[in-house]
Structures are given as structure tokens and as C-alpha cells.
């Protein structure tokens, strides 16, 4: 799932690097149909398990990717879902998959310049996307989310986090720099939400669960290498294998973390 500030330059960076058409399809191979975020459908079901919505509910998915989250929410609850992603190529793919469903909308836009009415959404949801935003723009986004939520609304997020920066080694620093991520601790993330006036802030370090998901995905990749190579190159396989090996290593040594955050407007 993707979003990032500075629409023109960073949109180009993402579409030409991590989220090329082929890159998106490679991610979907390992995450599962309609997903390019950790755990695919299984994690989505778990994370949404205590959320109550209905057919009249309105949901915003920030960094909606291929749309798996919106599709699941619409299927489970019948809710209206609006996905925003900065990458036009990904949004085009997502829209092709929901053609004819007028309760699911995918839009290519920069969430930091997009505006919605106040008190508009019952749920604002984001999966592994806000890592692309600078600290300043994380704050800006959460202020907008607070405004957009209905008084009874809920904010629900998973995102990449990290240990304190003084503990980062050169390898991890290079990874974060190359991806243009801004990673903070789980505790710092929760503090930002509190500072943006959210109430009942719940933060959890789900890194152990994330590591389990990574192990399953890594195993799936190797068990299905022959099928993968019918679709993609050996170079892509090596790159994906290396990426998952690194994330598994960094999660086990508590360098990279996976945060869960839930908060309410009132």
C-alpha cells in the first residue's frame, strides 16, 4: 500500500522503483490475490476482527493498493469503501477488479492534498503505508483523519516501525534510505496519535505475529518457485527472497517492528 508526500516526484519514484507494474504483481504473488501488504487476507481478517460496521458505514482506506482491504470490508459488512493511493498504475489495476460495484471507489490522489467533509467516515483504515510519510506529514495526515472521522469513528492502522535510531546498524540505515521510509518506534507513533487529539489510543507491537507471516510467505515463495519463474525472472526471485530474508532477520533481532494502532475520535 502506498502514499507519499510531494505528489509529482515521489509518485514517479514509487511507480518507477518499488511499485512498477511488475513489482506490484511480484508482491501480489507472495501476499496473495488483491494484496500488496503484510499478511494479505489472513492479516486483514485478524486486524478487522473487532470492528463493527454495517451497510451504511463509510470507510476510507489510505494507501489502498490493489484494494484487497476495501473488497474484504465491503464483502463482510456491505460498507461503502473509498480507497486512496498515490500510484495511478495500482489504482487502475484495483478499479479493474471491482468494476460494477458502486460501493467501492479507488482514487489516485495524494492524501495530504485530498479533502473530505468533516465527520464523514466511520472507519479510517491504513495498512503499511504511512511509513512513506515524513514525521511532519504523519502529523498532518492524522490531523486530517481526526477531522474526517465521525464523532463515533475509529482509526485503525498497521505500519512498519523500528527500534530507536541509535540502535540502527549501517545495513538497516541503507535499507530505510533506499526505500525513503520514515520509521519511528511504536511508542512514538502512539504519542503522535495522542497529540492529534485521538482518544482511547491502543498501540501494540505485533512483530512476533509479523515474523510468523513473513516465515509463511517466505516458505510459500520457495515452495512455488517453479510457478514464480514462469511469470517472473530469476533476478526477481532472488530480490524477493533477499528482501524477505532481511525482514525476517531484522524482525527477529528487533530492528524492524510491526505496529498496530487503534484510536477513536471521542
UniProtKB/Swiss-Prot annotation:
Top-tier EC class: transferase
Record membrane topology: Peripheral membrane protein
GO BP of this protein: methylation; phosphatidylcholine biosynthetic process
Result for mutant: residue 110 to A/N: Reduces activity
Molecular function via GO: phosphoethanolamine N-methyltransferase activity
Consequence the record notes for mutating residue 18 to N: Reduces activity
Binding site for phosphoethanolamine: 18, 27, 160, 175, 179, 181, 247
Entry keywords, A to Z: Cytoplasm, Golgi apparatus, Lipid biosynthesis, Lipid metabolism, Membrane, Methyltransferase, Phospholipid biosynthesis, Phospholipid metabolism, S-adenosyl-L-methionine, Transferase
Phenotype on disruption: Lack of phosphoethanolamine N-methyltransferase activity and disruption of phosphocholine synthesis from phosphoethanolamine. Growth and morphological defects in trophozoites and schizonts. Lower levels of parasitemia in the intraerythrocytic culture. Reduced number of nuclei in the majority of schizonts. Reduced viability of intraerythrocytic parasites. Reduced gametocyte production. Defects in gametocyte maturation resulting in the absence of stage-IV and -V gametocytes. Lack of oocyst development in mosquitoes.
Subcellular locations according to the entry: Golgi apparatus membrane; Cytoplasm
The keyword Cytoplasm appears for this protein: yes
Source organism, top-level taxon: Eukaryota
Result for mutant: residue 83 to N/E: Reduces activity
Amino acids binding S-adenosyl-L-methionine: 36-37, 63, 85-86, 110-111, 127
Regulation: Inhibited by phosphocholine. Inhibited by hexadecylphosphocholine (miltefosine). Inhibited by S-adenosyl-l-homocysteine. Weakly inhibited in vitro by amodiaquine, chloroquine and primaquine. Inhibited by NSC-158011.
Effect of residue 179 to K: Reduces activity
Similarity-based family: Belongs to the class I-like SAM-binding methyltransferase superfamily. PEAMT family.
Function recorded in the entry: Catalyzes N-methylation of phosphoethanolamine, phosphomonomethylethanolamine and phosphodimethylethanolamine, the three methylation steps required to convert phosphoethanolamine to phosphocholine. Has no ethanolamine- or phosphatidylethanolamine-N-methyltransferase activity. Required for gametocyte development, maturation and transmission to mosquitoes and for oocyst formation in the mosquito midgut.
Name the UniProt record assigns to this protein: Phosphoethanolamine N-methyltransferase
Gene: PMT
Amino acid at each position: 500500500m502506498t502514499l507519499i508526500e510531494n505528489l509529482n516526484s515521489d509518485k514517479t519514484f514509487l511507480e518507477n522503483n518499488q511499485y512498477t507494474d511488475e513489482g506490484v504483481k511480484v508482491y501480489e504473488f507472495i501476499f496473495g490475490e488483491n494484496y500488496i501488504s503484510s499478511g494479505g487476507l489472513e492479516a486483514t481478517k485478524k486486524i478487522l476482527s473487532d470492528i463493527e460496521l454495517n451497510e451504511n458505514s463509510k470507510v476510507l482506506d489510505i494507501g489502498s493498493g490493489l484494494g484487497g482491504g476495501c473488497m474484504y470490508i465491503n464483502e463482510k459488512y456491505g460498507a461503502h469503501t473509498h480507497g486512496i493511493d498515490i500510484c495511478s498504475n495500482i489504482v487502475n489495476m484495483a478499479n479493474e477488479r471491482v468494476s460494477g460495484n458502486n460501493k467501492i471507489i479507488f482514487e489516485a490522489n495524494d492524501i495530504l492534498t485530498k479533502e473530505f467533509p468533516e465527520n464523514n467516515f466511520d472507519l479510517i483504515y491504513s495498512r503499511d503505508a504511512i511509513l512513506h510519510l515524513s514525521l511532519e506529514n504523519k502529523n498532518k495526515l492524522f490531523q486530517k483523519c481526526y477531522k474526517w472521522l465521525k464523532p463515533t469513528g475509529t482509526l485503525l492502522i498497521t505500519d512498519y516501525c523500528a527500534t530507536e535510531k541509535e540502535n540502527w546498524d549501517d545495513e538497516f540505515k541503507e535499507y530505510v534510505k533506499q526505500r525513503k521510509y520514515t520509521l519511528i518506534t511504536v511508542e512514538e507513533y502512539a504519542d503522535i496519535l495522542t497529540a492529534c487529539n485521538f482518544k482511547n489510543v491502543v498501540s501494540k507491537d505485533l512483530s512476533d505475529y509479523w515474523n510468523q507471516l513473513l516465515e509463511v510467505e517466505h516458505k510459500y515463495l520457495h515452495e512455488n518457485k517453479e510457478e514464480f519463474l514462469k511469470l517472473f525472472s530469476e533476478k526477481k526471485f532472488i530480490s524477493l527472497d533477499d528482501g524477505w530474508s532481511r525482514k525476517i532477520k531484522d524482525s527477529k533481532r528487533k530492528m524492524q517492528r510491526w505496529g498496530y494502532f487503534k484510536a477513536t475520535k471521542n
